[in-house]
Amino acid sequence: DLRSMGLFKHYRIVRRWACRTYDLKDADLELLIHFDCIGLFTRKEYMNGTYTYSWDKDRWERLRREGWIVVWRQRNRVTQKYTIYKVSFRCSQLISRIYRILLGDEDLPVSSRNKIIDGNSYSDKVMAKAIYMVNKDKNR
């Protein structure tokens, strides 16, 4: 039973860590998780997938420019009418790491390289305390 596993118990903290560490927005990360589950997709499928997310005109180009979405097959105007995309290896590794952290196979990093642990703001200190609490919880 998924409820007894408590898979989403610490999802918010893990999501905020991933977004802060990799300079993503919450909607970007959730959209990348969605497309990682789909596999291959077109630009039109991307447009259909973004209807439920906040409007961001530059999201597509930003995700491509930063290497989160890559071309799987290029359009050639004769036999392939459109370009097919997929999430990059970097993106799939991030999503796999999020799953491992949620399942308790891996802890959130607490080294000084972590922007949140090393941060000086109040929200960073609160998040750092939450990260330590997540790492202590071995029943996640």
Question: Across the structure, where does each feature detected by a protein language model lie?
Answer:
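Short amphipathic alpha-helical interaction segments
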Residues: T50-E66
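A short, conserved structural fragment
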Residues: R64-R77
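Short, amphipathic alpha-helical interaction segments positioned at domain boundaries
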Residues: F89-V126
